A protein has these predicted regions:
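Extended alpha-helical targeting/anchoring segments
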Residues: 1-410
């Protein structure tokens, strides 16, 4: 983007304009890029491996440390800038506040730009559903972890890594109204370019081999006796017709003394998946490798993709095919999957145009590094008057983590 185009966007009312620079990156990886440019609090790495884990998807995203962060606990919203709290207030509807923030970011939609140029990045905890479902507000469990329900980083400096072309888009943002902002943005891109030319610092030594972690080393937040008692309760609810499925979950914990990024490195190597991420939120790091989305919104098309029904991967191609057929012929697995298709249709029907919801793919088997799942695709057209946060309200949490009917199961 040249300075004249930048100025014109300012005249059109845009105050948060992405400025990019493309550089060759055929000797780097997304992980090395993260280590060079982004190590530190309030940074992130998003990666994706295609089905089976044999190859990486096209784009990876590296988020440089964010200056501004939103943290929400209950109804209390706190704003942090450069690690210091600058504002804290109560809000009746935290999700509505986030929608207002998102709309106020005022990004132009530019065809020549990469697929993503910044925004809000972070997490919505499972208990965020209590902001949506009034029936669940009176049953808040004890907050053992003492972490916010929601944390979102303002991601204004990032790198879009093109794994196919071996190139990177360096991205920063500037306000055309501010004097000299274009030149300052170019200087920031210069610093990012210089940082990418450096060698990877040897700061991530893998720990020497220590004692093997065993199953008994993990502590449960539930306890076996309580868990089995609740299984019996759930069986009675099912027999009484109250629910069709309940997902009983427990948190397993064990001490971890290495660099959290080493944990992510090991996970991405052992279990490459379509949705992998490392979030460094200062005193909290989140590492994930998952095949599943909650929901996707792109060009007004809503997509949910139920995954249910599982088998391990075969040791040979013949065994792999046999396990796939066994999965598709399993009455219980198929029944559960059909239930989740219906749940997905019901969820997005709340926010999609009447008559637009369709099952665009049914009962396909997706194969990943270690397991295979039955997958279906449910899509619809978002109603014109609704926004992304409305979709989140309608779908949270994903059916595979709640049960059905959702509210009664939770």
């Amino acid at each position: 983007m040249d300075k004249e185009k930048f100025r014109q966007l300012g005249e059109e009312g845009f105050s948060n304009v992405p400025i990019t620079r493309e550089i060759i990156a055929d000797l780097d990886t997304p992980l090395s890029c993260y280590i060079k440019l982004a190590r530190g609090p309030y940074s992130y790495l998003l990666e994706s491996a295609a089905q089976g884990g044999e190859k990486w998807s096209r784009y990876s995203i590296v988020g440089l440390p964010a200056t501004k962060v939103i943290k929400i606990s209950g109804q209390i919203i706190s704003i942090f800038v450069a690690g210091q709290i600058v504002d804290s207030f109560s809000h009746r509807d935290p999700l509505a506040y986030i929608e207002e923030v998102f709309e106020g970011m005022n990004y132009p939609n530019l065809e020549e730009m990469p697929i993503y140029t910044g925004g809000l990045v972070g997490y919505f905890g499972y208990d965020t559903v209590r902001y949506v479902e009034n029936n669940l507000k009176g049953s808040v469990p004890k907050d053992i972890l003492e972490v916010p329900d929601i944390q979102l980083m303002y991601s204004n400096e990032l790198v879009i890594f093109d794994n196919v072309k071996g190139r990177m888009h360096l991205v920063t943002h500037a306000d055309p109204i501010e004097q000299g902002s274009f030149e300052q943005a170019q200087l920031r891109l210069d610093r990012m370019s210089v940082g990418m030319a450096a060698e990877v610092p040897i700061t991530l030594k893998l720990p020497e081999e220590g004692p093997e972690i065993r199953e008994d080393d993990f502590l449960s937040s539930y306890g076996k006796e309580n868990f089995l008692a609740d299984v019996a309760r759930v069986k009675n609810y099912i027999l009484d017709g109250d629910v069709m499925q309940v997902v009983l979950s427990q948190r397993m914990s064990a001490p971890f003394e290495s660099d959290p990024l080493n944990f992510y490195r090991a996970l991405r190597s052992l279990n490459p998946s379509p949705y992998m991420y490392f979030l460094d939120l200062d005193d909290l790091q989140i590492v994930s490798s998952s095949p599943e989305i909650l929901a996707k919104l792109e060009n007004s098309v809503v997509t949910v993709r139920p995954l249910a029904g599982t088998r391990r991967r075969g040791l040979t191609e013949v065994e792999d095919i046999e396990l796939e057929q066994d999965l598709l012929n399993d009455e219980k697995e198929v029944a559960e999957h059909l239930m989740l298709i219906d749940l997905g249709r019901n969820d997005i029907a709340k926010v999609c145009r009447p008559g637009s919801v369709v099952v665009s793919e049914t009962m396909a088997v997706e194969k990943y590094a270690h397991v295979m799942h039955i997958a279906s695709n449910v899509q619809g057209q978002l109603q014109q008057n609704l926004k992304p946060m409305d979709l989140l309200r309608a779908t949270l949490p994903v059916g595979t983590l709640s049960g059905a009917p959702k509210v009664r199961a939770m």
